[in-house]
Amino acid sequence: MAEKMIVKELDQVVVRFSGDSGDGMQLAGNLFSTISATVGNDISTFPDYPADIRAPQGSLTGVSGFQVHIGAGKVFTPGDQCDVLVAMNAAALKTQYKFAKSTACIIIDTDCFQKSDLEKAAFKTDNPIEEMGIKNDVIAAPISQMVKDCLADSGMDNKSMLKCRNMFALGLVCWLFNRDLTIAENFLREKFAKKPAIAEANIKVIHAGYDYGHNTHSSVAHTYRIESKTTVPGKYMDITGNKATAYGFIAAAEKAGLKLYLGSYPITPATDVLHELSKHKSLGVVTVQCEDEIAGCASAVGASYAGALAVTSTSGPGICLKSEAMNLAVIMELPLVVLDVQRGGPATGLPTKSEQTDLLQVLFGRNGESPMPVLAATSPTDCFEAAFEASKIALEHMTPVVLLTDAFVANGSAAWKLPKLADYPAINPPYVPAELKGSWTPYQRNEDGVRYWAIPGQEGFTHILGGLEKDNATGAISTNPENHHLMTQLRQQKIDKIQVPDVVVEGDKDDAELLIVGFGGTYGHLHAAMDEMRAEGKKVALAHFKFINPLPANTAEVMKKYPKVVVAEQNMGQFAGYLRMKVDGFVPYQYNEVKGQPFVVNELVAAFTEILNK
């Protein structure tokens, strides 16, 4: 054993796992994130994987990565660069080293750096460390061989044994961060409950990786420890945005006293919501995997008519197909939540990458005057709140609502404090009053202009809804010009009357020289950029929007308060254009990227500083 290891105390650290898309890097990263969140650290994760089901082994295009930022206190992003890089093959080292700090510790499986591996990764020599000019601490271990040695008496074949390589790497990283392996053991025994031999093999390999680090660490300068500084007591868990979204819908249905119906068609990156909700039939959840996107949305409209909290989920291409059924819900004035987990486009585009390019589509991408509330979740944990709020708006205002997330928020995870349902407000749909029995008409409204909801089967409230325009007074089909104009106004006024919270200004809200504006899943990166600039003595504030339509009442006041405003978004300026349409005389600076990747905080700081200095 080498000399006593120095334990370095850190407030935050970034770890990136990388390897072939079949090497289990997503599982290893998720499990390490769960361990960290469970012990009280804050986390922010970024799964980054190719669209291929299984890319050619060892290819540069087939590398799958998972980055997690762990903090003693609050962290806002997965981090620009990592402190520890796990590269399970030559291609991973070649493509992922750019994400490593100059001081990073690098872990490689030398068994996957053979001549053929190096050729696939376009290395020109047999020494990739020297060729790339890497001066970092490197743990170069024959991981594949050690895994096979560890499981030699397991009875597993060679291929099955090598599937455990990710657990060896996880054990080694857990050693680097002084993590207890108990949580990982429990997770694996639960995951492989029907295959206990597989669970125990993986557990054995995790311990082998941990022990290897403990006993053979002469090439590493130090290990790390990140203490928890969590100030809010409670039970925490690591949760992805998609899972939080599913839980938010379940909570809303419970508070409304309704069944939850999801009509969906599988599409990356939204499918996990369908998977999660399908596990909860005992909570009154009904899920239907339909034959296509159109059927998914149309069936949800039918479920809404029947009296359920109805949801349909998709990504950008699916919104194109669902638009007709969404418009049907608009004219029928039925509650519906449409979840759009945005991805790179247009067309099939970049299915596993993230953008904010669906904003104008969900605002205006339907025929006719078709007003619809739009919300955008700001983080993985905020997906729970946003799903609840979208459901509440839909049910209480009898309207379809679009909830925007994106691949970064949906697949990423964060430490989430389990909420108490009693702390959330009741949801009160505008059910038709019993005293209107016999005199009620389908488009009769309450004092807020919201159509009453009559559930089929109620005696005295038989009615028909449909896609043809209806007479406001009788509910009969009408082509009367004045009536159509009136109904168009009533549908718009109903949306305009929805009360949403004011947009909050953070940072130097009283005297900022630059206001950063964003919406949805870019919140963490923009907040981190603001923090860095303020630490340098610059006067900067942030206004981040969750409610897009209707906009908060104080939007114009905030936009006009500061001498310079920059709107930063992952599209070519859709939100900036929307704000210009809504706020007279508003001419902001713009920061636009459409790379399929999250913002890089250092690049944001440089761009915002340049604007500030103009």
Pin down the residues of each PLM region.
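Short beta-strand segments
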Residues: 69, 87, 107-109, 139-142, ...
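Thiamine diphosphate
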Residues: 12-100, 247, 252, 260-261, ...
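Short glycine-rich or small-residue beta-strand-to-loop segments that form or flank ligand, phosphate
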Residues: 13-20, 169-171, 260-263, 310-313, ...
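Gly-rich Lys/Arg/Thr-decorated short loops/hinges at beta-loop-alpha junctions or inter-strand turns
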Residues: 52, 149-151, 218-234, 252-259, ...
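Active-site cofactor/cluster-binding pocket
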Residues: 2-256
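Short gly/pro/ser/thr-enriched loop/turn and capping motifs at secondary-structure boundaries
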Residues: 50-54, 113-117, 146, 294-296, ...
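Flexible, low-complexity linker and terminal segments
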Residues: 231, 238-248, 256, 386, ...
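Conserved thiamine diphosphate
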Residues: 134-136, 140-144, 353-402, 406, ...
